[in-house]
């Protein structure tokens, strides 16, 4: 199934609605079907590229707020501080438009982890990365990401 998601990318990205479906599959499908393996993040790079494409092409602005929030998920999951800043900005803009959904909390907590560590320490053991002493303390104290 993942191969189909990748092969037909151009078709998926033709409309804002199918674009968000594709981004959600890339961002969430792999996280849930390949949990606790390096494959959990195998859709991240393409999902991020597609999300940025949606934002900068103007398709993002045509989506309802909930779909905009889903479009931003790959930004929130990126291990790049500049992308995290962009995520926090867009989620804060969504929060200004919504009285009922707190879009800021999760975006800020993801951003803080990447700003502090340059990555998400919880991924280390699955990606074969060494965990630093500070990351170990963070994880021992309930760090989520």
Predicted feature residues:
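Intrinsically disordered, low-complexity activation-like regions
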Residues: 1-145
